[in-house]
Protein backbone atom coordinates (compact mmCIF):
# COMPACT_ATOMS: atom_id res chain seq x y z
CA UNK A 1 0.00 0.00 0.00
CA UNK A 2 1.25 3.45 -0.78
CA UNK A 3 1.82 6.45 1.46
CA UNK A 4 -1.52 8.01 0.51
CA UNK A 5 -3.35 4.95 1.78
CA UNK A 6 -1.54 5.13 5.10
CA UNK A 7 -2.14 8.89 5.35
CA UNK A 8 -5.84 8.38 4.68
CA UNK A 9 -6.00 5.65 7.32
CA UNK A 10 -4.39 7.99 9.85
CA UNK A 11 -6.88 10.70 8.87
CA UNK A 12 -9.74 8.26 9.54
CA UNK A 13 -8.25 7.40 12.95
CA UNK A 14 -7.91 11.10 13.80
CA UNK A 15 -11.48 11.83 12.71
CA UNK A 16 -12.74 8.93 14.84
CA UNK A 17 -10.73 10.15 17.83
CA UNK A 18 -12.15 13.65 17.37
CA UNK A 19 -15.72 12.33 17.25
CA UNK A 20 -16.17 13.15 13.55
CA UNK A 21 -17.72 9.78 12.80
CA UNK A 22 -19.16 10.76 9.42
CA UNK A 23 -15.73 11.68 8.07
CA UNK A 24 -14.10 8.64 9.65
CA UNK A 25 -16.74 6.35 8.15
CA UNK A 26 -16.46 7.94 4.72
CA UNK A 27 -12.69 7.45 4.68
CA UNK A 28 -12.84 3.84 5.91
CA UNK A 29 -15.46 2.89 3.31
CA UNK A 30 -13.24 4.32 0.59
CA UNK A 31 -10.17 2.54 1.97
CA UNK A 32 -11.97 -0.81 2.12
CA UNK A 33 -13.09 -0.31 -1.49
CA UNK A 34 -9.46 0.33 -2.50
CA UNK A 35 -8.49 -3.04 -1.02
CA UNK A 36 -10.74 -4.93 -3.44
CA UNK A 37 -10.26 -7.20 -5.26
CA UNK A 38 -8.05 -9.27 -2.99
CA UNK A 39 -4.86 -10.43 -4.74
CA UNK A 40 -4.75 -14.20 -5.21
CA UNK A 41 -1.45 -14.93 -3.43
CA UNK A 42 1.92 -13.67 -2.30
CA UNK A 43 3.25 -10.75 -0.32
CA UNK A 44 0.79 -8.31 -1.87
CA UNK A 45 -2.13 -10.45 -0.66
CA UNK A 46 -0.63 -10.54 2.84
CA UNK A 47 -0.26 -6.76 2.86
CA UNK A 48 -3.83 -6.23 1.66
CA UNK A 49 -5.18 -8.63 4.30
CA UNK A 50 -3.23 -6.82 7.01
CA UNK A 51 -4.56 -3.44 5.94
CA UNK A 52 -8.06 -4.83 5.57
CA UNK A 53 -7.93 -6.03 9.17
CA UNK A 54 -6.82 -2.60 10.44
CA UNK A 55 -9.37 -0.67 8.39
CA UNK A 56 -12.24 -3.05 9.15
CA UNK A 57 -11.47 -2.89 12.88
CA UNK A 58 -11.61 0.90 12.78
CA UNK A 59 -14.83 0.74 10.74
CA UNK A 60 -16.33 -1.63 13.31
CA UNK A 61 -15.45 0.75 16.14
CA UNK A 62 -16.92 3.68 14.22
CA UNK A 63 -20.16 1.78 13.70
CA UNK A 64 -20.41 0.38 17.23
CA UNK A 65 -19.16 3.24 19.37
CA UNK A 66 -19.74 6.18 17.05
CA UNK A 67 -23.08 5.37 15.46
CA UNK A 68 -24.38 2.67 17.83
CA UNK A 69 -24.98 0.49 14.76
CA UNK A 70 -24.17 -3.03 15.98
CA UNK A 71 -25.29 -4.85 12.82
CA UNK A 72 -22.87 -2.89 10.64
CA UNK A 73 -20.15 -3.19 13.27
CA UNK A 74 -20.62 -6.94 13.42
CA UNK A 75 -19.99 -7.31 9.69
CA UNK A 76 -16.80 -5.24 9.97
CA UNK A 77 -15.54 -7.25 12.94
CA UNK A 78 -16.24 -10.46 11.00
CA UNK A 79 -14.21 -9.03 8.12
CA UNK A 80 -11.31 -8.47 10.53
CA UNK A 81 -11.45 -12.13 11.57
CA UNK A 82 -11.72 -13.28 7.94
CA UNK A 83 -8.47 -11.40 7.24
CA UNK A 84 -6.54 -13.73 9.61
CA UNK A 85 -5.03 -10.79 11.53
CA UNK A 86 -2.32 -10.67 14.16
CA UNK A 87 -3.45 -11.65 17.65
CA UNK A 88 -4.06 -8.12 18.94
CA UNK A 89 -6.40 -7.20 16.08
CA UNK A 90 -8.19 -10.54 16.36
CA UNK A 91 -8.70 -10.03 20.09
CA UNK A 92 -10.03 -6.50 19.57
CA UNK A 93 -12.48 -7.71 16.92
CA UNK A 94 -13.59 -10.53 19.22
CA UNK A 95 -14.11 -8.01 22.04
CA UNK A 96 -16.29 -5.93 19.73
CA UNK A 97 -18.35 -8.98 18.79
CA UNK A 98 -18.69 -9.95 22.46
CA UNK A 99 -19.87 -6.42 23.29
CA UNK A 100 -22.53 -6.69 20.57
CA UNK A 101 -23.69 -10.10 21.85
CA UNK A 102 -23.78 -8.84 25.43
CA UNK A 103 -25.76 -5.74 24.47
CA UNK A 104 -28.26 -7.85 22.50
CA UNK A 105 -28.72 -10.22 25.44
CA UNK A 106 -29.31 -7.26 27.77
CA UNK A 107 -31.97 -5.87 25.45
CA UNK A 108 -33.64 -9.29 25.20
CA UNK A 109 -33.66 -9.75 28.98
CA UNK A 110 -34.97 -6.22 29.48
CA UNK A 111 -37.74 -6.75 26.93
CA UNK A 112 -38.75 -10.06 28.49
CA UNK A 113 -38.80 -8.54 31.98
CA UNK A 114 -41.10 -5.70 30.92
CA UNK A 115 -43.37 -7.78 28.67
CA UNK A 116 -45.86 -9.69 30.86
CA UNK A 117 -47.21 -11.51 27.79
CA UNK A 118 -44.21 -13.87 27.71
Annotate the PLM regions.
Residues 34-49, 66, 83-90:
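Flexible helix-coil transition and linker loops at the boundaries of alpha-helical arrays
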Residues 3, 44-52, 69-72, 89-92, ...:
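Structural signature of alpha-solenoid helical repeat junctions
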Residues 13, 17-20, 39, 64-68, ...:
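Short coil/turn linking the two alpha-helices of tandem helical-hairpin repeats
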Residues 9, 16, 28-31, 35, ...:
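Inward-facing hydrophobic residues that define packing positions of alpha-helical scaffold repeats
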Residues 10, 14, 18, 62-63, ...:
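Residue-level signature for tetratricopeptide repeat
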Residues 50-68, 97-118:
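Alpha-helical linker/edge segments of TPR/alpha-solenoid repeat scaffolds
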Amino acid sequence: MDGDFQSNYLAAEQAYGAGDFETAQSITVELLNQLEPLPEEGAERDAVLAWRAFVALLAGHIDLYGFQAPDQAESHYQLVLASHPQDTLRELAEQGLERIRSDRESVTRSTQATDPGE
